[in-house]
């Protein structure tokens, strides 16, 4: 579950994402919190390496329609499902969810064709040159997976 601080940050991030945007989601509490904060948005798209239950919620609520993505119209494109049995059942046989390899979901030429793409990820630290570390803290790998 996202923390109270993550929910406040998520509210600010969601305010920066316009209706009709396509989102890419990382893993962890912050991307989950941002998805929850997006429930008032309209006609969002999803093109992401992985999705969790909150994306299924947004599709069911009509927030994610994938109508304005520029490519893969009408379909949430993802390389993996990370969530509950409900998510697996939701995606199984669902034409609105398209499973693709990372060669597609992370391909620069494909990503360049996605309209109005916003990447939502969390990080552990950022250095002075702008490089983001999202996996290691204090010499130890962080558990970055959070399912909601």
What do these predicted ranges mean?
Residues 1-148:
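Conserved alpha/beta enzyme-core scaffold
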């Amino acid at each position: 579950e996202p923390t109270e601080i993550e929910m406040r940050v998520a509210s600010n991030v969601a305010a920066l994402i316009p209706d009709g945007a396509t989102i890419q989601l990382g893993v962890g509490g912050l991307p989950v919190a941002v998805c929850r904060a997006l429930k008032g948005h309209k006609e969002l798209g999803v093109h992401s390496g992985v999705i969790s239950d909150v994306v299924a919620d947004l599709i069911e609520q009509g927030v994610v329609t994938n109508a304005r993505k520029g490519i893969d119209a009408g379909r949430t494109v993802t390389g993996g499902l990370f969530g509950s049995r409900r998510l697996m059942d939701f995606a199984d046989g669902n034409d609105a969810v398209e499973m693709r390899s990372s060669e597609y979901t992370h391909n620069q030429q494909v990503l360049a064709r996605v309209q109005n793409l916003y990447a939502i990820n969390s990080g552990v630290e950022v250095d002075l040159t702008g490089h983001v570390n999202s996996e290691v803290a204090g010499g130890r790998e962080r558990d970055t997976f959070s399912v909601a």
